[in-house]
């Protein structure tokens, strides 16, 4: 996996917001010095020209919170191979984000027990403080008929996780375009939603569905190429 600072997921510099500050990385403009401003932000050349202390003003940058949502619902996959590929995709995205020092949440479907009277609407957040722990937890997940589908997982993740900037929805070939659209609508405006359909029998590809980026991959190696292509088209 390439660094999450490139392509679609790039955010080391951040996306500037309209909020102004005196201590961030996106330079915006100069203004007159005010009591309490740090001297290190004084712009000496402009100060000399105007005869008044001038300081740099910046735009705040939006730090990236990546969410990787993996469905464990049997109905979202046509084969065990699809599910295994989906788990590998979730692991690759999560590990890359952890190694890049990003804020990342990896969530999977909750499975409703047989004795429960109603469906449990929740997701399980996996450990993301170190790559090895995340991979250990992914190694024991499995599909289940009683697991929440990708639409429910997306909706709950959107409610539970604050400050999401990029959401990856990882599923199999049985997830329909309508279900993916509904899942993407769970996230607030401004969140980049990317659905990754894992299908070893399919030709890798990219398409846009109502503002949603949909990547189809047949092998894990396709993921890097697919993400790079998405960034080029977006």
Model-identified regions with their sequence ranges:
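Membrane-proximal, non-transmembrane interaction regions of membrane/secretory-pathway proteins
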Residues: 1-7
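Exposed, interaction-prone extracellular/peripheral surfaces
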Residues: 12, 32-234
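Intrinsically disordered, low-complexity linkers and stems that provide flexible hinges
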Residues: 10-33
């Amino acid at each position: 996996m390439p660094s999450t600072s490139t392509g679609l997921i790039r955010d080391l510099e951040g996306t500037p917001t309209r909020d102004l500050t005196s201590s961030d990385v996106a330079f915006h403009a100069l203004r007159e010095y005010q009591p309490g401003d740090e001297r290190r932000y004084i712009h000496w050349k402009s100060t000399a020209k105007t005869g008044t202390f001038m300081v740099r003003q910046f735009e705040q940058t939006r730090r990236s919170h990546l969410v990787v949502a993996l469905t464990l619902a049997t109905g979202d996959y046509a084969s065990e191979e699809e599910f295994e590929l989906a788990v590998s995709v979730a692991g690759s995205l999560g590990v890359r984000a952890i190694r890049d020092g990003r804020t990342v949440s990896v969530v999977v479907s909750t499975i409703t027990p047989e004795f429960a009277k109603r469906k449990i609407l929740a997701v399980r957040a996996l450990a993301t403080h170190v790559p090895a722990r995340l991979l250990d937890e992914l190694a024991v997940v499995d599909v289940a008929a009683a697991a929440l589908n990708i639409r429910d997982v997306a909706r709950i993740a959107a409610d539970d996780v604050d400050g999401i900037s990029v959401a990856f929805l990882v599923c199999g070939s049985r997830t329909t375009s309508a279900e993916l659209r509904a899942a993407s609508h769970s996230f607030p405006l401004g969140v980049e939603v990317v659905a990754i359909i894992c299908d070893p029998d399919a030709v890798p590809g990219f398409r846009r569905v109502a503002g949603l980026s949909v990547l189809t991959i047949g092998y894990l190696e396709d993921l890097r190429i697919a993400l790079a292509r998405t960034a080029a088209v977006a």
